[in-house]
Structure formats: structure tokens, C-alpha cells
UniProtKB/Swiss-Prot annotation:
PROSITE patterns: ZINC_FINGER_C2H2_1, ZINC_FINGER_C2H2_2
Listed Low complexity bias regions: 63-84, 289-307, 409-426
Keyword Ribonucleoprotein: no
Family the UniProt entry places it in: Belongs to the pacC/RIM101 family.
Taxonomic source organism: Debaryomyces hansenii (strain ATCC 36239 / CBS 767 / BCRC 21394 / JCM 1990 / NBRC 0083 / IGC 2968)
GO molecular function, one term: DNA binding
Protein keywords: Activator, Cytoplasm, DNA-binding, Metal-binding, Nucleus, Repeat, Repressor, Transcription, Transcription regulation, Zinc, Zinc-finger
Role according to the record: Transcription factor that mediates regulation of both acid- and alkaline-expressed genes in response to ambient pH. At alkaline ambient pH, activates transcription of alkaline-expressed genes (including RIM101 itself) and represses transcription of acid-expressed genes.
One GO term of the biological process aspect: positive regulation of transcription by RNA polymerase II
Motif YPX[LI] motif positions after renumbering to this chain: 471-474, 611-614
PANTHER family: PH-RESPONSE TRANSCRIPTION FACTOR PACC/RIM101, PH-RESPONSE TRANSCRIPTION FACTOR PACC_RIM101
C2H2-type zinc-finger residues: 163-188, 199-223, 229-251
Protein name, UniProt field: pH-response transcription factor pacC/RIM101
């Protein structure tokens, strides 16, 4: 008995021929048609068919969601129903709850052809099979997951060979990986023009398929130990050009790793500077309170000695001005800068070649030595511009020197006979002239950049607005003056404002502004109105933005950096002179340049007889 009925047999129940069926018929569920049931079976079509598809009612088998006995005949028409399982996202049922499985019945398995229609739910990921098994990304045959391919990195021993081809059954052996790669591209991959193009990789059952020949040839580099693409900065090599391009971004200055490392280093340096400044500010405040505001009070000897060893500026020279201490703020800063400059000069002049060598190392010049001739080509040098990064970098050199030599700035000045440092300095014997020229050019450019920044900062400090007198002083006018308000006595210009004076009047008296005079364009000596809140907010915003620029740098720090760079330039110049002098000594001492006395006399005679003598008449 078979349930494989033609779908058209459900359209007209009257014309169905008698057919044996199961015990549960469909007469009650499909009663809208004109047909009748014959026993427990189904009716088949007669020879004459009269179909009216437009007149089919909603209760017909075509529109019913499922028959009352859940027979498989309704599975073909359930998709067009309003309540079909496909629209509800449910799986179709082929058997009722009370029925037994057809496969478990006594009938032969070959007499049944059960339709197994699989409908997936929209929100479901798994797939339900007729047998009840569920699979999720696994192989349905054996249930095993396809193993992930792992490619081993190429080592040095892999480059020694021999190199065997593992493409299917090919067993050709080559001496070099280049020959193996050419063999794979020409013989196994082929070309479209030769009608033998293969876009699937059969190396050890890799089975990777591409859409272009360039893609499969690029993929073959994974299997072949060939790295023809070399990095210009580091000794690494790569198989594909895109790998080299990706790697080259590591050496860029704006790489996230480099930026993060530089930011962390700057943060540590700033934290160290803050701790150092905080300690000394606290000690200086105690020292000021004890010596200036309360002169009778004296510190204990141990505390005073401890402060003298830690303070960066000697304040003992300022004790003569303790009476008018509040009246001389500029004198205090000038003396501090002067004393600090003396200490810095001692610090740099005491034969300190370690700092110069450290600066050359950190700027990737490697001691200007020929020990590593390709070292400069493998490092990316920074630009010789005095910006924020360069400011912090030079500050770190000075901080490291202070931390390693904390008491050297208190030492006395060396004697004058030891001043020429180039006579006592020892330079390396093997010097790379190319690195020497590059270093000299770099630090000269950096010195010029520091000079420009120093001039800009010094100009800002020089033209700082000074507090001036609010009201102009009115001069005493003599009674014998006939000119009254408009004249002046003794050639001295007036010090009060005059609105109607001509513009060129002040040109005859350029000193009028120096004696408290008022400009020609000032109409009154009354104070101007206070600035509005908006102007104040604008000024605060501009001031906060200026703090972010390099103008916030201290002038003494810029001078310190200038002196450091000048010391490096002097070191390089002395090294260059020493090298030239040594070469001259070597050339003079060589036997090729030695002449005998007779040869020298002959040369002198030739030089003397070069021009003819003019006889006097």
C-alpha cells in the first residue's frame, strides 16, 4: 500500500476512484466537496476531469492545514494554508500521536515511500532530520568536525633542503625552494591560456579553492619554505608582500606600540619630576619661612645641612636682600638662573663624555663608531626639530645625569690648565665618517631650531606687560607761562593729555612717554570699564590653550638644552679635527711622502726659477 498520491486527486473528491486506505479516513475533514467516501479508502479520479480551481472553498483539502487523522496526504497542501506549520515556524508531523511508526508496522519497508519534508524555523540554527538527529556544523556522515589546518612556521633547518613536492602523488625533489615554487605554479596550477588551470590546492589534501590564479599562487607560499620579501629595517623576511607591508607598520613612528611605550616613558619621567619638584618646593618653603619671615629663628644644624645637600639653587647669596625680599622677585629669579647656569657649565665641562655618548646612542648614532656600520640604516631617526617630544627627551638626559651624579654640581671648578677638553678626550680609533657627518648635521639643525625657540621665548619674556601708573601726573605750570596749557617750558613736553594735538607733535619729543606721559589718542585718564564675563572666559580659554603649546616651557630649560646640544657639537668637531690631524700625521710619516735633501733643493730651485728675472737697466 502506498501513499504516493497525485496532488490533483485532492481537488475533486467525487471523481476519486476507490482505493484502500487506513482506518482513519478524511471524510469528516474534507466534506465541502461533492465527492463521497467509499468505505475506508480514498477515491481516485475518473477518466473525465472537471476542475474548477477558482471555486474551491476554504474548507477544501487545498486550503486545510491538516486532516483530522494527520494523514500524509495533507502535507502537499499545507504550505498554502493560513495556519500552515511553515508559517508558524513549526516542523511538520507525518504521524499522529496515537499512531505507530509506519516503519515499525508489519508491512514491508519497500512498500512505503514516506515523504520527508524538512522545514526550518527562522530562529533555529540546528537542522532536524527525519530520524530525529540534530547537527550543528558537523559532518552528517560520521559526526566528526573537520580539523582546522595549522601551518607551522618556517625555521632555519627547513631552508636546507631537499624539498619534496607533496601535490597529490607527485614526488619530485628539488634543491632550492625557488625551484619547487616554480614547479607548483607551472606544472600543477597551470595557466588559463594552456587550458590546464587548477584553482584548488592539493598539497597534502589542503583543498583550498580560490577564484583567481594569483590567489592560489600566493597561497602556495604557505606550503613552500620561501621568504623572498625582506624588511629594510630589521632582519625579518616574509613569504608574501602583504605580510611585509603589514610588518612595516611596526617600524613607523606613529605605531600604537611605540606611542604607548613613549607615553609610558614620558609619564614615568613626569612623575619623577613632580616628586623631585614637590620635595624641593616643600624644603624651600620651610627655608624661606625660617630665614626671611623670621630671621631670629635658626634651623638646627642637621636640618640645614640636609637642605643644603638637596636644594638645587643656593639661596645663601640672597640673604642680603631679606629686608626688601618682596620687592625683588626678578632679582631672585635672575640670581637663581645665574647660579644654575654656573652649575650646568661645571656639569658639562668636567670631562663628562658619558652624557654626550648617551645622547648619541639615544639618537641612534651608536657612538659614531664603525662597530656597527649598518646600525644607522636599521633605525629610524627622529626629526631635528625642537618640539614637545624633543623637549622631554633632552630633559630625561639631564634628569638621568642628576640621578647618577647627585653631588657633582657642588664640586669646585676645575683648574684652567685642564680646560681644553679635546686634549684629554679619548676618541674611538675606528670612526664611521658617514655617521659622523650625519650626527654633525643633525645636531646643527637641532641647535638652530633651539635658537629660534629661545628667541621666541625670550621675546615673550622681554615684552611682558609691566604694571604702570593708573593716573598720569599733572605737572606744575609756571605763572609766567604765556602759552598756558598749550605750551611748555624749557623744551620739556607736557605730561597731561591733549586731544587736539597734531599727530606729528610727539615725533618732536620722543621722550614724552618715558616720563609718565599719555598717548595722543587717550581722551581721559579714567580707568576703563571692567571686562565682561564673556571676555574673561575667552581670556581664560586662550590662556589654557597657551599652556598646551611649547611657550609654556621654561626659559632656563631651553638654555640648558641649547648647552647640551652645543656640547655634543663641540665633541663632534673636536673628534673631526683629531681624525684629520691623525690622518695628516700618518701621511707625513709614510715613506711615499719622504724626500731627500737633494730632491727638496731641486724643488725649491724649480719654484724659484718659475718666473724669469727682470734685469735692471
Amino acid at each position: 500500500m502506498s501513499f504516493n498520491l497525485h496532488p490533483i486527486s485532492y481537488l475533486d473528491a467525487d471523481t476519486n476512484a476507490g482505493r484502500p486506505g487506513n482506518d482513519q479516513g478524511t471524510g469528516n475533514g474534507h466534506g465541502h466537496g461533492a465527492g463521497h467516501e467509499h468505505g475506508n479508502g480514498y477515491r481516485m479520479f475518473d477518466s473525465d476531469l472537471n476542475l474548477d480551481i477558482d471555486g474551491i472553498s476554504t474548507g477544501s483539502p487545498l486550503t486545510s492545514s491538516q486532516s483530522t487523522n494527520d494523514s500524509p496526504q495533507s502535507s502537499f497542501t499545507s504550505q498554502s494554508s493560513e495556519n500552515s506549520p511553515h508559517q508558524k515556524g513549526e516542523y511538520m508531523k507525518f504521524f499522529g500521536e496515537g499512531d505507530k511508526d509506519i516503519r515499525g508496522s508489519g508491512l514491508s519497508e519497500g512498500s512505503y515511500d514516506v515523504p520527508t519534508m524538512i522545514v526550518e524555523d527562522e530562529g533555529s540554527v540546528e537542522t532536524k532530520i527525519a530520524g530525529g538527529e540534530t547537527t550543528s556544523g558537523v559532518d552528517r556522515d560520521d559526526g566528526s568536525v573537520k580539523p582546522k589546518k595549522i601551518y607551522r612556521k618556517v625555521k632555519d633547518e627547513d631552508m636546507k633542503g631537499p624539498f619534496k613536492c607533496h601535490w597529490n602523488d607527485c614526488a619530485v625533489i628539488f634543491d632550492t625552494p625557488e625551484l619547487l615554487y616554480d614547479h607548483l605554479c607551472d606544472d600543477h596550477v597551470g595557466r588559463k591560456s594552456s587550458n590546464n588551470l587548477s584553482l584548488t590546492c592539493y598539497w597534502d589534501n589542503c583543498l583550498v579553492t580560490t577564484v583567481k590564479r594569483d590567489h592560489i599562487t600566493s597561497h602556495l607560499r604557505v606550503h613552500v619554505p620561501l621568504k623572498p620579501f625582506h624588511c629594510d629595517v630589521c632582519p625579518k623576511s616574509f613569504k608574501r608582500p602583504q605580510d611585509l607591508k603589514k610588518h612595516s607598520k611596526i617600524h613607523a613612528d606613529d605605531h600604537p606600540k611605540k606611542l604607548k611605550k613613549a607615553h609610558r616613558r614620558q609619564q614615568e619621567e613626569h612623575d619623577h619630576e613632580r616628586e623631585y619638584e614637590h620635595e624641593h618646593e616643600h624644603e624651600q618653603e620651610q627655608y624661606r619661612q625660617s630665614h626671611f619671615h623670621n630671621p631670629s629663628h635658626s634651623q638646627p644644624q642637621s636640618q640645614s645641612h640636609q637642605f643644603q645637600t638637596m636644594q638645587p639653587y643656593p639661596f645663601d647669596n640672597m640673604l642680603n636682600y631679606d629686608i626688601n625680599y618682596q620687592m625683588y622677585p626678578s632679582m631672585q629669579s635672575d640670581m637663581a638662573m645665574m647660579n644654575d647656569g654656573v652649575d650646568r657649565k661645571r656639569r658639562f665641562d668636567n670631562g663628562n663624555n658619558n652624557m654626550v655618548n648617551n645622547i648619541l646612542n639615544d639618537f641612534n648614532f651608536h657612538n659614531i663608531s664603525a662597530m656597527a656600520p649598518d646600525y644607522s640604516n636599521k633605525k629610524v631617526k627622529v626629526e631635528p626639530s625642537y618640539n614637545l617630544d624633543m623637549f622631554n627627551k633632552l630633559n630625561s638626559f639631564d634628569d638621568r645625569y642628576i640621578s647618577s651624579h647627585p653631588h657633582q654640581h657642588q664640586a669646585q671648578a676645575p683648574p684652567h690648565h685642564a680646560h681644553p677638553q679635546h686634549q684629554q678626550q679619548q676618541y674611538p680609533n675606528n670612526v664611521n665618517s658617514q655617521n659622523l657627518l650625519e650626527a654633525e648635521k643633525f645636531f646643527n639643525s637641532l641647535s638652530s631650531s633651539i635658537d629660534l625657540q629661545y628667541q621666541k621665548l625670550s621675546t615673550n619674556y622681554q615684552y611682558k606687560p609691566q604694571p604702570q601708573q593708573l593716573y598720569p601726573s599733572v605737572p606744575q605750570i609756571s605763572k609766567t607761562n604765556d602759552n598756558g596749557m598749550g605750551g611748555h617750558n624749557g623744551g620739556v613736553p607736557p605730561n597731561f593729555p591733549q586731544v587736539n594735538r597734531s599727530f606729528n607733535y610727539q615725533a618732536n619729543h620722543p621722550i614724552s612717554m618715558e616720563f609718565g606721559g599719555v598717548s595722543n589718542f587717550q581722551k581721559s585718564a579714567k580707568p576703563l570699564e571692567e571686562a565682561s564675563s564673556e571676555d574673561k572666559e575667552t581670556d581664560d580659554a586662550i590662556e589654557s590653550l597657551n599652556k598646551l603649546s611649547i611657550n609654556e616651557f621654561k626659559l632656563d630649560d631651553v638654555a640648558k638644552h641649547k648647552q647640551m646640544v652645543d656640547s655634543v657639537i663641540a665633541y663632534l668637531a673636536n673628534m673631526k679635527k683629531t681624525i684629520v690631524a691623525n690622518k695628516e700625521i700618518e701621511t707625513k710619516s709614510s715613506p711615499e711622502d719622504t724626500y731627500s735633501a737633494s730632491q727638496l733643493s731641486e724643488k725649491e730651485g724649480l719654484s724659484r726659477n718659475l718666473y724669469p728675472k727682470i734685469a735692471s737697466f
